[in-house]
Regions:
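N-terminal acidic, glycine/proline-rich low-complexity segments
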Residues: 1-104
Length: 104
C-alpha cells in the first residue's frame, strides 16, 4: 500500500487503524505490500488475480515463506500481471481510503 496515501488520504478518520498500524510498524513514509487485504479482495473479486500452479509453501526459521511448484502440491499463491497490479493498487487506494457512507 502506498505510504503517500497513508499519510494524506485518511485525514477524515482521525485515528484510522490502518494508518496507526503503519505508523507503529516503521517510520513513515514507506510503501508496503498488504497481503491480508489482497486475500480478502481475492474472495470478493477473484477476476482481479491469477493463481499459480500447485506447489508447497514452506516457512523458514526467520519467518520467510518460499513457494516451490510441484504437481502434487496442495498450495497455490496469488499472482498479478503488471496490469492487474495497477488495478488492485487503484482499487485499494480508492476503496480503503474513502470515507464510509455512514460517516458522510
Amino acid at each position: 500500500y502506498p505510504g503517500a496515501s497513508i499519510e494524506t488520504d485518511f485525514a477524515w478518520a482521525g485515528k484510522h487503524p490502518m494508518v496507526e498500524g503503519y505508523k507503529a510498524y516503521r517510520k513513515m513514509p514507506y510503501d508496503r505490500p498488504t497481503w491480508d487485504m489482497m486475500s480478502v479482495l481475492y474472495v470478493l473479486r477473484p477476476e482481479m488475480f491469477g493463481v499459480s500452479e500447485p506447489g508447497i509453501i514452506c516457512v523458514d526459521d526467520q519467518g520467510y515463506t518460499y513457494f516451490t511448484p510441484t504437481p502434487r502440491g496442495k498450495h497455490t499463491v496469488l499472482t498479478l500481471t503488471p496490469g492487474q497490479q495497477d488495478a488492485v493498487l487503484r482499487f485499494f487506494v480508492r476503496e480503503l481510503s474513502s470515507k464510509p457512507a455512514k460517516y458522510r
